[in-house]
């Protein structure tokens, strides 16, 4: 399974309904499970981004999940593929 980090900003619609944000995350988590994605951590943040979500799953399942969640109109996200130390060691081990 791959690890992804999503940095999220609320849209105007999302911030107007910010009180619903915890419930939206719970619903997104249920959708994630149905797609074979595990939400490992989620944080609401102050500063440049409104939330950070760390999830694991197959690449196509993460993509489907993030597209669906984004299509609801409450967030915009940038999703990053993340590598732990063991994965990075394998990657650099393949370098000539």
Where on the chain are the PLM-derived regions?
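A compositional/biophysical signature of low hydrophobicity enriched in polar/charged and small residues
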Residues: 1-96
């Amino acid at each position: 399974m791959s690890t992804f980090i999503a940095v999220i900003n609320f849209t105007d619609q999302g911030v107007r309904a910010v009180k619903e944000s915890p419930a939206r995350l719970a619903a997104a988590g249920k959708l994630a499970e149905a797609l074979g994605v595990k939400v490992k951590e989620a944080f609401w943040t102050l500063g440049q981004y409104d939330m950070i979500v760390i999830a694991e799953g197959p690449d196509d399942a993460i993509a489907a999940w993030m597209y669906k969640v984004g299509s609801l109109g409450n967030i915009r996200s940038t999703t990053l593929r993340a590598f732990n130390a063991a994965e990075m060691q394998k990657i650099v081990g393949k370098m000539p």
